[in-house]
């Protein structure tokens, strides 16, 4: 039995019957918590823990988190206007269940924030 916990997110714990199963369950647990936290506009903590195994989340969740951090104190409406899209279009980008940016959208956002997103 392998247990998994995230020191920066004490409310996230899981286990698996093998190492690979534990990592699979860790990804599922972490993604679930991050989706809920994003839905409720809660702050996502920066990982400060340097040990252990890294758990990669889906690109949609990673993008939503990166976009929200880049926006920082600006409102969604401000960023939407600056990038030439509607407020609702921008809102969907910060929702991991609905985000699916086109290359054109990524290009616009990179110009607004003066940075690249998700170098995959």
What would you call each of these model-derived segments?
Residues 73-92:
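Short alpha-helical DNA-recognition segment
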Residues 48-73:
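A short, Lys/Arg-rich alpha-helix, primarily the initiator
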Residues 1-41:
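DNA-contacting interfaces and partner/effector-binding or oligomerization modules
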Residues 24, 65, 69, 92, ...:
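DNA-binding alpha-helical recognition surfaces that contact promoter or target DNA
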Residues 102-120:
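DNA major-groove recognition helix of helix-turn-helix/homeodomain DNA-binding modules
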Residues 95-97:
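Residue-level detection of the helix-turn-helix DNA-binding "recognition helix"
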Residues 18, 75-76, 102-105:
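Residues that mark the N-terminal boundary/hinge immediately upstream of a DNA-recognition element
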């Amino acid at each position: 039995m392998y247990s998994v916990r995230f020191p920066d997110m004490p409310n996230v714990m899981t286990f698996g019957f093998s190492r690979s199963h534990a990592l699979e369950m860790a990804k599922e647990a972490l993604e679930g918590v991050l989706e809920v936290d994003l839905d409720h506009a809660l702050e996502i903590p920066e990982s400060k823990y340097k040990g252990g195994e890294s758990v990669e989340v889906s690109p949609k969740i990673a993008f939503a988190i990166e976009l929200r951090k880049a926006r920082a104190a600006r409102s969604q409406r401000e960023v939407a206007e600056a990038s030439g899209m509607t407020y609702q279009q921008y809102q969907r980008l910060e929702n991991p269940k609905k985000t699916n940016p086109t290359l054109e959208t990524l290009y616009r956002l990179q110009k607004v924030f003066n940075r690249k997103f998700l170098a995959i």
